[in-house]
Design a protein with these regions (language model features):
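Non-cysteine beta-strand/loop elements that form the S-adenosyl-L-methionine
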Residues: 77-79, 88, 194, 401-404
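Divalent metal-coordination and catalytic microenvironments
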Residues: 26, 47, 67, 78, ...
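Histidine/acidic-residue-rich, glycine-tolerant segments that coordinate divalent metal ions
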Residues: 63, 85-87, 95-106, 112-113, ...
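Metal-dependent amide/peptide-bond hydrolase catalytic core
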Residues: 215-479
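Conserved short loop/turn motifs at secondary-structure junctions
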Residues: 31-32, 141-145, 294-299
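Acidic/His- and Gly-rich active-site-bordering loop/insert found
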Residues: 2-107, 112, 116-137
């Protein structure tokens, strides 16, 4: 490692308290998707103090922003997130479910850590550019609404990510590895039906039930399920049943639908069929309805070149190591959920040899923390969830690291994740993420041939191009 790079990475240790303090402050005041005003202010203030040029209200989204430094190419984007989840309030460092505020929000996906680790990486790359005098630009992107709102997809609609030569990000996890493969695209639409209220016994013939329309829509979609391909999914939630009085014909009712498919073009087609069912349900029930587009995401394009680089950078940085006290806390959390039965890691799902190595490294899934880097696995494996990182990957080569921030086997979106969010386990993940992403970004700046290889792979995978799931007139909506 050359001295300039070493000094740049040392920036992360020198400012460690800054990065962990931002994460802790965001953990303390968890804000839901597209409402992350305090978090956005913390980041933009920090970026300005670190010497970045800040742009707020990015792509017209109030809590989206960027901080850039440098000039010319390559332009390396580093993605950060910071939204929380509802109903996951939990006390820090406590190995049992104890809320801070009953029913309150909590960082059950570790996004307080995600943004802080990415900021640390951007700060180190900035120092490298300044000290080396090399051409290049690093941009930290504050991306709100990953849990709902799909801000990165709205940004993709505006073509934002085409301006990057590559994008890097990470996500807190229970493993240390590099993400690969692809996943589902998705689209969410809210249907609000409006009828006519009436006394259900004395005047039912003059009523037009919005709740009937919702139920008829649900029945129609149930029949649709037989006539869609096996790789599609349809989910729904009745968000407003109209009230609690059965003797009233319900004048208003709403249902939120999400469709998924392995290709975004198929999600768009399936969504149109669901739209037609909503129209038919309103016609049958004698109601009107309003269709409100919420969000959507594309499937992810993997980039094996960047994945290999990120894995090598991870190996160079080294994974977090833990004290006896940290392992004791991790063990106490592990006792709150069933023991693991599956070898950890994405590669273990698709490669039997990696599964064997994973079992050995984890001592047959008995280690409380996965304190090892899993072997590199780059493949076309399918993961059923959805993420707006996918939309970024359609506009520029993209790769994502997963870094252990909570105990082995802890499920995401759980109180156990929240309990770890301000502990030293989490803080170590922040610093590791910063160094790993920064090391990879510096390699892309230093090696134009490597970046060109990643871009050639991206061009080959992107084929006919990006199909944006976000409708032209849609605006981000917090629901």
């Amino acid at each position: 490692m050359n001295e300039i790079k070493k000094a740049a990475l040392h920036t992360i240790d020198a400012h460690a308290n800054t990065f962990t303090a931002i994460s802790d402050a965001i953990w303390d005041e968890p804000e839901l998707s597209l409402k992350e005003f305090k978090a956005a202010a913390l980041y933009t203030d920090a970026l300005e103090k670190l010497g970045f040029t800040v742009q707020k209200n990015l792509c017209g989204i109030e809590t989206a922003f960027s901080g850039s430094y440098g000039s010319g190419h390559p332009v390396i984007g580093i993605l950060g997130e910071f939204d929380a989840l509802s109903g996951l309030s939990q006390q820090s460092g406590v190995a049992e479910a104890q809320s801070v505020t009953p029913g309150g929000n909590g960082h059950g996906c570790g996004h307080n850590l995600l943004g802080a680790g990415s900021l640390a990486a951007a700060a180190a790359v900035k120092e490298y550019l300044a000290a080396s005098g090399k051409p290049g630009t690093v941009v930290f992107f504050g991306c709100p609404g990953e849990e709902g709102g799909a801000a990165k997809a709205y940004m993709a609609r505006e073509g934002l990510w085409y301006g990057l030569d590559a994008a890097l990000t990470w996500h807190p996890s229970d493993t240390n590895e590099v993400s690969t493969g692809t996943n589902n695209s998705c689209i969410q639409v809210l249907y609000k039906f409006h009828g006519v209220a009436a006394h259900a016994a004395g005047d039912p013939h003059n009523g037009r039930s919005a709740l009937d329309a919702v139920e008829l829509m649900n029945i129609g979609v149930q029949f649709l399920r037989e006539h869609m391909t096996d790789d599609c999914r349809i989910h729904y939630a009745i968000t407003d049943a109209g009230g609690v009085s059965p003797n009233v014909v319900q004048a208003n009712a709403s249902v939120l639908y999400m469709v998924r498919a392995t290709k975004v073009a198929d999600s768009v087609k399936l969504q149109k069929r669901v739209d037609a069912i909503a129209e038919g349900a309103a016609l049958m029930a004698g109601t009107s309805y309003k269709r409100i587009f919420i969000d959507g995401t594309a499937e992810t394009l993997p980039n094996f070149t960047l994945e290999a680089l990120l894995h090598a950078s991870f190996a160079e940085t080294g994974v977090p190591q833990y004290t006896a006290e940290e392992l004791a806390f991790a063990s106490s959390l592990c006792r709150t959920f069933p023991p693991q039965t599956r070898a950890p890691g994405i590669g273990a799902k698709f490669d039997s040899e990696i599964a064997k190595e994973s079992r050995a490294f984890s001592e047959n899934m008995t280690k409380p923390m996965n304190d090892f880097l899993l072997p590199l696995y780059s493949g076309e494996g399918f993961l059923p969830g959805s993420t707006d990182v996918g939309d970024v990957s359609w506009q520029t080569p993209t790769a994502q690291a997963l870094i252990a921030a909570w105990p082995a086997g802890v499920p995401g979106h759980s109180w156990q994740v929240v309990a770890c969010g301000k502990t030293s386990l989490a803080h170590k993940a922040i610093l590791c993420a910063g160094k790993t992403l920064a090391t990879a970004a510096i390699a892309l700046i230093d090696d134009p041939a490597l970046l060109q290889k990643a871009r050639e792979e991206y061009a080959g995978r992107a084929g006919s191009g990006y199909v944006c799931p976000i409708e032209p007139d849609a605006v981000p909506i917090a629901i």
